[in-house]
Curated annotation (Swiss-Prot):
The gene is rpsQ. Keywords: Ribonucleoprotein, Ribosomal protein, RNA-binding, rRNA-binding. One of its GO terms (cellular component) is cytosolic small ribosomal subunit. InterPro entries: NA-bd_OB-fold (IPR012340), Ribosomal_uS17 (IPR000266), Ribosomal_uS17_bact/chlr (IPR019984), Ribosomal_uS17_CS (IPR019979). One of its GO terms (biological process) is translation. Part of the 30S ribosomal subunit. One of the primary rRNA binding proteins, it binds specifically to the 5'-end of 16S ribosomal RNA. Signal peptide: none annotated. This is Small ribosomal subunit protein uS17. GO terms for molecular function: rRNA binding; structural constituent of ribosome. It comes from the Bacteria. NCBIfam families: PRK05610.1, uS17_bact. PANTHER family: 40S RIBOSOMAL PROTEIN S11 FAMILY MEMBER (PTHR10744), SMALL RIBOSOMAL SUBUNIT PROTEIN US17M (PTHR10744:SF1).
């Protein structure tokens, strides 16, 4: 069985070795045929903490890594040039 893959945007990188990726699914409504967008948020494993907020990434399904984490970062498609500000 093939592993599932999704493409989405990093919406949170505040956890250690974990990012939250928002994936937008578009499909036609069964009755009205209007294109409906639904956003699903996945927690994905990022072992080197390389992803930043706003990055476009490809995630793949993996074994359960924690209570809510079943996806891993496969590659970063578009890197944002944001830098993190350190609060003092």
């Amino acid at each position: 069985m093939a592993l599932k893959e999704r493409i989405g945007t990093v919406v949170s990188d505040k956890m250690d070795k974990t990012v939250v990726v928002a994936v937008i699914n578009r499909y036609p409504h069964p009755t009205y045929k209007k294109i409906v967008s639904r956003t699903t948020r996945y927690k994905a494993h990022d072992p080197e903490n390389t992803c930043a907020l706003g990055d476009r990434v490809k995630i793949r399904e993996t074994r359960p890594l924690s209570a809510h984490k079943r996806w891993a970062i496969q590659e970063i498609l578009n890197k944002t040039s944001q830098t993190k500000e350190v609060k003092k």
